[in-house]
Every structure is written in structure tokens, then in C-alpha cells.
Amino acid sequence: MEAIQLFFLKNALQMKNNIIHYCNIKNSEVYLDGKKLYSAKGEEQFSSFIKGVYKNFDLDYPKFYKMDPLCKLAITTSSILLEGIKDNIDPNMAIVLSNKSSCIDVDLKHQASISQGDESYASPANFVYTLPNIALGEISIKYKLRSENSFFIFDGFNPEFLIKYANSLTLLGKSNSVLCGWIEVVENEYNAFMFIVKQETGIAFTKENLIKLI
Amino acid sequence: MNLTQNKIPVYVTNGTCVTPLGINLIDNIQGIKDGRVAISKNIDNNLQKDPFYGAVINKELLNKTFSNLKYEGQFSTLEKMMLLAIDEIANNFKGQFNDKCGIIISSTKGNVDALSTDNRETYFLHHLAKKVSNAIGLETEPIVLSNACVSGIMAISIAKRLIQSGSYNHFIVVGGDLFSKFVFSGFQSFQAISSEPCKPYDKARDGITLGEASAAIFVTKDRALTQANSCYEVIGDSSINDANHISGPSRTGEGLFQSVDNAMKEAQIDSSAIDCISSHGTATNYNDEMEAQAYNRAALEKTPVFSLKAFFGHTLGAAGLLEAVISLAFADEDLIPPSLGYNEHGLTLPLNINNKIQEKKVEIILKTASGFGGSNTAVLFKKCITDEK
């Protein structure tokens, strides 16, 4: 009996990070914890699709319309994920996002605006979005997360890295939970996968599971 | 469990850099001591009709120096700058490449000018990272950190965490960004470019001067690998977002204050233990004032503080790393570098701006940076005592 109690105590103390919620936006559909919540099959334009998602989920955040495509995708995915646990958001939750193409759409827009010879002029409203970590800033502002923020770039989804870094943040006491994910958009091709990891019961935070869930 | 007591110590050593002041660390340190600056007046009609100030690397010298190294193949200007910066580290630590050694590359815009060419592939930061890591023969997947102007110093912090949590034993950390029309025109549109070389913390400051540079450092848990004359332990680090505005810093310095406070708590020191601050000091009104707020809140208003921006300009994703490398090299000689461009105090709160080279026993250095997206980073370095080795 004592041995069993000790076993549980030990497990509780050393509980690992698990995936407690996750959200996907891809192929004109929105999923929360694996359940389809919205579908706009046939909508091929990213801009119309993401506006449809914004309206469908009543996100009520007018700043959305000013954002570049990466921030629109990031704020939408994170809002759908976080609204469900709104009263329970840890202000110290870290944000760790990653992608391949940085913020290429707004970069191209800015580049085009400065490549027209004498006619060229840059727009501060575009320029301010020409860094991928602005997406982290937007999520932090909306949910008042004064926390660790980092944006990483890889050739493709890198579950091993996300596991290593998210686990280091909780292990070293930098945060108690981590909003993690992959957020990629290039013109009309997009894939957003965000999840929350925490030392609570949930889906095991493993490479195999992340590959399955993205 | 007391996390602090169980932490694996992590050290940095062998810092290097490539700037318009010099293509190695020694030339840069000597340049600062001689009062030379990397910023100069430039004329480039492609950027703007009027002359402008910027810290631009002499590409002829860069290409010539690079061609003396052994790297084969085609490399962009930024890739050459990064390889020049890590060449010595790669040679010195080749023996560690197969011992859980990673590489972190920090850059905000990488080869961004590739966007206006047909060679779109080189725009991707991972492409640049892979070229650099392949060139030195490192097989692990490169990690790119692109977190605005804190990237360079945050990269050291990420390396430390990944080592302390057992995933890696060593890291090569390299940062770099170019002086590009892309960024210059953007800051112009913000009216944030200074008409003269930037003047951090000065009353007459009117904005930033842009620059280009690369810098590198080796991060390891193996004390025996560090150079006897330059070894620092990373004793605390934190990066807290302001959650306030995407392009302006918090007026109260909240994120920076919390970052500094967390780093001090981790290091188990109070503000009086810090010998000097290598600050961000971009010379915009908002940034410098925000730093004054944060340092005062952290009881650091009497600690000597310096910004290196008037020497190198704002080098974006390289800045935090470059400034750490320079600050540690000065600390090796128990010197505090000067904060150039400061004549009349231009902040609403007191700060001890170190306006000339000062001899002082330097044991603990605080490096901070802040940037777009509300980002802030603070890292504390402590000089290794030689006989502990």
C-alpha cells in the first residue's frame, strides 16, 4: 500500500508535460481538439477564408483587419484555442511558434512598395509586420501574456525541437505552460497547428503524437 | 526541488565579430579604444537621394578576406559574414561537433534582398542556416531564431536552456543582419532614422542609425573547453514580452524590468552585484526612456550603463550578440566601454551613462535588448575565476 502511494506521489511530482488542448486551421477547415468546428470547403482564397473564420467565431478584435496574413492566422488560431479556457489562462504561459516562410507575404508587399523607382514609398503599416515574432506580440497583447516569447524557423515542422524547448522552459521554471506550434502561410497555402502543453493530464507530448495531430 | 541549485553551469567563450570596424574581435576592440566608429556618411542613390549615415561593411575587403578561407561554393554577403565570424570557433571546437553540438542562427531578415531577385530560395532563413552549418561540417539541424532585435542575445539564452535541460552539450551561436534597402526604407517610413550618427540617451537624440554585422560565440557546459582568458558563466536569463504594443515599448518598461528582475533572481544576486550594463540604447526617444524606467525600477540607476549603437549602428539580429561579445572582451581587461554620442542627459530619470572608457573590476555584466513585437531579453554573465578551472 505504502509503495503504491509512494509511486503515485513520485509520479505527481515528476508529471510530464502533456498536450491539453490543440487547434488546427488547414484545408479550409477549423478543428479544436480534433473536432471539426468550421468548414468552408471550396474557399480557396486565404484572405476570404480567414475573414470567414474570424466572423464565424465572433472574435470581435477589429485590429485583425490591419494584420498581415501570418498574424491573422496566428491570432485566429490562438483565439479559438484560448477562448475555451479563458478564465484559466496562465499569464506566464510562454509562446513558442515556428514556421518555414517567416512573414513572406508582407515582406513581398513591402519589397514591391520600395521597388518602383521614384514612385517607391514604404508604408509603416506594412513594415511593422515584417518580422515573424510580431505574431507572438499580437497574441501576448490580446491575452495579456507577459511571458517568454520566441519565434523559430525550420525547413519543416520540427516536433523534436518544440518538445525539447518547451520542456526546457517548464523544467527550468521559466513558465508553467507553453503555447506551442507551427504557423505557416504563403499566399493561399496555409497550415496552423497550435497546442498548449502543461503538467496536467492530456495527450502525451511526443513526436509521434505531434506528427499525428498536425 | 531547488531548481537553481541543480542547474548545470553553462559558459560562453571565444566571442568573435565582423563589423565595418574590423573583421575580427581584436580590430574591433582596438577600434573602440582608438575612438573609431563603424558609422560613416554614405551616398547610395538606390536608398535615397540625400547622403545618410550607416555602418556598412566594405564588401571588397570582406570578399578578399573570405576568399582566404577554405570554403568552397557560392555564398551571399551575409553568409560570408557569418562564416568569417564562426570560422575560428568551428576550427577550435571541431572535436565537439559529434558531442551533441548544435548551432543557433539569429537573424531578423537574412538574405532579404533575394526577394527582389529570381533566386527566391535564398530568402528562406533555413536555407541560409543550412548553408552556414554545412560549410563548417556540422550535421545537426540548424535552429534559426528570428525574434526582432532581441534575437542575438536571446540566442545565448536559448542555447543555455537547451544545454541545461540536457538536449545539447554545446552550441555555436551566430547572429547577422545586413544593411538593406528593405529595413532602411521601413525605418524611414517610421521617421525613425537619425539625421546624424545616433546619440543614445542624449537630449538631442533623434533616432537610430542602421548597421550591418555578424557575431558569434561558443556556448558549452564543459568548463575545460573555455579559454582561460575569456570565460563567462551565463548565470541568469529571461525574456518577457511587454504585451503592450507591437512597434512601441512599454512606457513603464514592464517587460524589460521583469526580464532583468527574473535574471537577477535566477542568478541569486541583487542589483548591487552588477558591475555594468551593456544596454540596447537605440537612440529613439521611446526606447531610451523606456530603458531608464526599467533600470530605475530594478535599482540599477547608479550602475554604469553603455550603448554601443553609436559605434556599430543598430545591427538588428546581430546587435545583442555583437554587443555581448564586445562587452565581455572589455570585461576581460576590467574595462567598461564608452557610450558614445552622450553629452547632455536626455531622460526623465537618472542613469549612470558611462561616457568614456573606465577601468573597473568587472565581474558581473548585464546585457539587455528590446525590440518590435514587445520583446525584451536580459542575460547576466559572470566572469569565471581562473583557479576554479
Predicted regions and their residues:
Chain A
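Conserved "HGTGT" condensation-loop signature of ketosynthase/thiolase-family condensing enzymes
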Residues: 3-214
